[in-house]
Swiss-Prot record:
Record's keyword terms, sorted: Calcium, Disulfide bond, Glycoprotein, Lectin, Membrane, Signal-anchor, Transmembrane, Transmembrane helix
Lineage of source species: Eukaryota, Metazoa, Chordata, Craniata, Vertebrata
Keyword Glycoprotein recorded: yes
Membrane-spanning segments: 36-56
Protein name: C-type lectin domain family 10 member A
Membrane side Extracellular: residue ranges: 57-304
Disulfide bridges in this chain: 173-184, 201-296, 274-288
SUPFAM superfamilies: C-type lectin-like
Amino acid sequence: MIYENLQNSRIEEKTQEPGKAPSQSFLWRILSWTHLLLFSLGLSLLLLVVVSVIGSQNSQLRRDLGTLRATLDNTTSKIKAEFQSLDSRADSFEKGISSLKVDVEDHRQELQAGRDLSQKVTSLESTVEKREQALKTDLSDLTDHVQQLRKDLKALTCQLANLKNNGSEVACCPLHWTEHEGSCYWFSESEKSWPEADKYCRLENSHLVVVNSLEEQNFLQNRLANVVSWIGLTDQNGPWRWVDGTDFEKGFKNWAPLQPDNWFGHGLGGGEDCAHITTGGPWNDDVCQRTFRWICEMKLAKES
């Protein structure tokens, strides 16, 4: 179209008469050509700007796409690592479960063995209980027999004493007992707690010694020769009392200074509820479970 306009312009120039000025139509066409050129340049610039913007956005999109791909690759790697870790944990759990099953089976077998052992123990306890009861019966019979033998021995001892005195009937103490002022005394060579010593004397048809006077105290003190020995005095069941029922409050006393004190600082539990003769002679209260020597006493009796 531009070309046709130029051609038309040239034809008009040739047809114009010489010596005349260009017409107003020609000038208008020149101006139209300029506008068209400027429009084309503007349009080109606009297209260039659009292309630049699109190119810039495309570059940004490519960068964003690269970032997304990198993020996706990183996330994929992490997910793969997590899956591998989960697989490893699953294997460990399976091994742990297998081990637990083995342990449970072992414990089940041990429990069964324990039940069997418990039944055996119960059976053994029953057997031991029966044997213990039989032994107690035998021990009771044996104790009665020993006591009878002691009586027989005492009778023989007294009969021997009677023969030595030309048949005169005399009072006598059992063998290895010491006679003093109408009583027989037996001084132990071993040590026992107060309850065990009390039991021993009762089995001998006697009791732990009861000190009734200063004279008896001096006799015992001289015979003991500085040996600590239990006597038949206790307050385990209330106030102090003698084992043979002798009135303690009205009777002879020989406590050491500041005694009895019922001391709790010995660390053995409880107080001090049993009395003994000290090495110097005075009495002292002490823990009944301590072990000392002891003295048994019985009244002198005649045997026919």
